[in-house]
């Protein structure tokens, strides 16, 4: 329980897991990871929280024999936009499930020169450009004012485990980087990307905040394993990492259906091309991401 939050606010987790099945790690899947391949003995449970509904049911199971719980951040049909995600409910429900740590898997747009499509990266810093989101559990007149130390938003030990896991399976990855969290759901302008680069951002995403801060409020170690989907707007494509192919078209990760919706349901040839390129980058990166994730989970058991 968090100091200052009344016991009456404690959520009820439907059919709560037994101690034997209590998950060691909570895995949050983003764009490109709507389901967790390799998850065995899967059973889903609906979580109820004082903060409302989660993005979907929690998927309990075993990954490489280790009990874990998985939650698709955008919903299992990728139906929830970044600014509409109930981050408080998601993080709270995973904590109540009994996890010891959270690993967030995300797709990002690369700004730094070495963050090419298909590259994996473990960021170490965040700049928050979001607004209007529910950013804290300590909100309202009946709650105390709490200032968490957020100097280093990602847990150092958990980051090290992810990096060591990549080394153990022979998977190259970038071991640091500043994640710029934009509001979305639109993509960034070329001028904005220039600004983000001047600010020190190495990559762009839309979901790290307030997710990382909420995990810190609950004393949950939190780290991210991200896959670069493509280069941010206005930046040269450069060669793709690994087998991702040429996927450097400006813009960032957007599911095919979202591109169509943004254009009133009609897609032109360029949008089709963008969706295919992003899909190719993520298709190439996801097996490598899952390899690293699985190894990290076994190290945390």
Predicted features by range, described:
Residues 233-301:
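His/Asp/Glu-rich mid-to-C-terminal helical/loop segments that flank catalytic regions of hydrolases
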Residues 78-83, 180-183, 200-201:
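Short, flexible loop segments at the rims of nucleotide/cofactor-binding pockets, characterized by
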Residues 187-235:
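A C-terminal functional module that forms or caps the active site or interfaces directly
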Residues 31-32, 109, 126-127, 178-183, ...:
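Glycine-rich beta-alpha junction loops
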Residues 153-197:
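Active-site rim beta-loop-alpha module in soluble metabolic enzymes
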Residues 2-151:
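Metabolite-binding pocket within alpha/beta catalytic cores that recognizes anionic/polar moieties
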Residues 99, 125-127, 131, 163-171, ...:
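Generic secondary-structure signature for well-ordered alpha-helical cores
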Residues 119-124, 221-224, 240-243:
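Short, hinge-like loop/turn segments at secondary-structure boundaries
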């Amino acid at each position: 329980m968090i100091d200052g939050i009344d016991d009456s606010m404690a959520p009820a987790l439907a059919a709560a897991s037994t101690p034997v099945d209590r998950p060691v790690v909570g895995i949050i899947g983003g764009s490109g990871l709507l389901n967790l391949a390799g998850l065995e003995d899967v059973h889903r449970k609906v979580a109820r929280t004082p903060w409302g509904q989660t993005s979907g049911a929690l998927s309990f199971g075993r990954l490489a024999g280790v009990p874990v719980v998985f939650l698709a951040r955008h919903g299992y049909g990728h139906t929830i936009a970044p600014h509409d995600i109930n981050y408080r409910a998601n993080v709270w429900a995973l904590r109540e499930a009994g996890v010891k740590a959270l690993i967030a898997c995300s797709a990002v747009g690369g700004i730094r020169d070495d963050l090419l499509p298909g590259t994996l990266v473990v960021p170490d810093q965040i700049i928050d450009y979001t607004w209007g989101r529910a950013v804290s559990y300590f909100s309202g007149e009946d709650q105390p004012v709490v200032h968490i130390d957020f100097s280093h938003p990602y847990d150092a030990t958990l980051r090290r485990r992810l990096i060591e896991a990549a080394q153990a399976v022979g998977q190259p990855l970038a071991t640091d980087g500043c994640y710029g969290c934009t509001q979305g759901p639109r993509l960034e302008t070329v001028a904005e990307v220039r600004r983000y680069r001047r600010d020190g951002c190495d990559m762009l995403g839309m979901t790290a905040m307030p997710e990382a801060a909420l995990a810190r409020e609950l004393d949950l170690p939190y780290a991210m394993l991200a896959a670069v989907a493509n280069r941010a707007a206005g930046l040269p494509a450069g060669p793709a990492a690994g087998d991702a192919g040429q996927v450097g078209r400006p813009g960032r990760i957007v599911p095919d259906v979202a591109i169509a919706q943004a254009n009133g349901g009609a897609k032109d040839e360029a949008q089709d091309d963008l969706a295919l390129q992003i899909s190719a980058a993520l298709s190439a990166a996801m097996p490598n991401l899952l390899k690293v994730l699985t190894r990290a989970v076994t190290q945390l058991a």
